[in-house]
């Protein structure tokens, strides 16, 4: 114990000296914020497991495997990872597993942000219900924290967020809105709305939350709005590669799942079959390679709704019948799962509340 304490003290001195030297440099290769992020990462690593973190004996790795298998056995084949709150998706994935990078991708209006928000809320609610000291961290690069919280309240109160923003709700709905808001005040969900955040800054903030509050999962909306390494001059594809590698590194370092949203290329719209493929991921090489799970959100009803035939025709009657069949459904196409099967999960999507839920017949 004394030897370990002396080692920690020596490492602290070393980190302090390196930080001081970096701060004294007159060249501007690193900003003050970069120096803070680097130092905090070193301190976090030292506080967690010291410099031997990357070197693990097989016996220790095997103990972790036994612990994982024991938890799975006790759950009778149920959820071992962080629950998504969607039964069929959890059955397919077994929950969202620590150290995994999970990609949710889709074209605009498919509902990828809605799905990520639903999962974040469900995971945070699970933490709250179990009394665990932990949290969910949501990096919202596209929407403000107010817009994101409005969505969540809309989902739970079952009031259209569009009507909430316009003030077009009844007194009863407003009372329900306030009551729902009151019930969510203790939800262990943190929102970071920093635009164009760098992977280094994201890692720093995640470590801080994990140290202070505990952290079960990170959600990032979305990859293409992030920044890679400062002053990157190798092109956008290389920058996306740095970002996905960084997200995977954060997942491994903090031993949590990282859920990251991604755009798809426009070539999806140019095909007769609009179901996305792995090759449709924008700057796809590194996203596909670095991820553990890739799932696409696809709604046939969205495309069908844009092809409405002339009313009072046989074609319109057939179109309406098809819309009644699929208009409220969404498919989650799991096209990559490193440690499990691929496949499709069908969910219901309540567009007015931006809410996904299990189908009645599943």
How would you name each of these model-derived features?
Residues 86-95:
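Pre-Walker A adenine-sensing motif
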């Amino acid at each position: 114990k004394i030897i370990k304490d002396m080692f920690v003290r020596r490492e602290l001195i070393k980190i302090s000296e390196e930080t001081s030297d970096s701060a004294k440099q007159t060249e501007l290769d690193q900003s003050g914020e970069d120096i803070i992020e680097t130092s905090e990462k070193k301190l976090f690593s030292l506080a967690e497991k010291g410099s031997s973190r990357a070197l693990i004996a097989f016996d220790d790795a095997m103990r972790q495997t036994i612990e994982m298998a024991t938890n799975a056995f006790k759950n009778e084949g149920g959820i071992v990872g962080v629950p998504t709150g969607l039964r069929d998706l959890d059955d397919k994935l077994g929950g969202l597993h620590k150290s995994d990078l999970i990609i949710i991708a889709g074209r605009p209006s498919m509902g990828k942000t809605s799905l990520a928000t639903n999962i974040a809320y469900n995971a945070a609610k699970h933490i709250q219900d179990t009394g665990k000291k932990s949290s969910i961290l949501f990096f919202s690069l596209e929407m403000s924290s107010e817009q994101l919280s409005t969505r969540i309240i809309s989902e739970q109160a079952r009031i259209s967020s569009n009507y909430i923003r316009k003030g077009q709700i009844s007194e009863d709905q407003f009372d329900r809105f306030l009551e729902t808001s009151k019930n969510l005040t203790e939800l262990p969900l943190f929102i970071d709305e920093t635009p164009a955040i760098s992977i280094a800054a994201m890692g720093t903030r995640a470590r801080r939350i994990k140290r202070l509050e505990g952290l079960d999962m990170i959600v990032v909306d979305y990859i293409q709005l992030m920044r890679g390494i400062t002053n990157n001059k190798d092109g956008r594809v290389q920058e996306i590669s740095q970002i996905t590698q960084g997200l995977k590194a954060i997942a491994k370092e903090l031993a949590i799942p990282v859920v990251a949203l991604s755009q798809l290329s426009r070539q999806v719209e140019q095909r007769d079959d609009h179901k996305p493929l792995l090759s449709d991921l924008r700057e796809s090489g590194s996203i596909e390679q670095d991820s553990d799970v890739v799932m696409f959100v696809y709604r046939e009803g969205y495309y069908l709704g844009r092809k409405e035939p002339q009313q009072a025709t046989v074609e319109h009657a057939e179109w309406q019948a098809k819309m009644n069949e699929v208009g409220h459904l969404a498919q989650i196409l799991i096209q990559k799962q490193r440690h499990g099967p691929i496949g499709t999960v069908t969910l219901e999507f309540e567009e007015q509340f931006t809410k996904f839920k299990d189908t009645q017949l599943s």
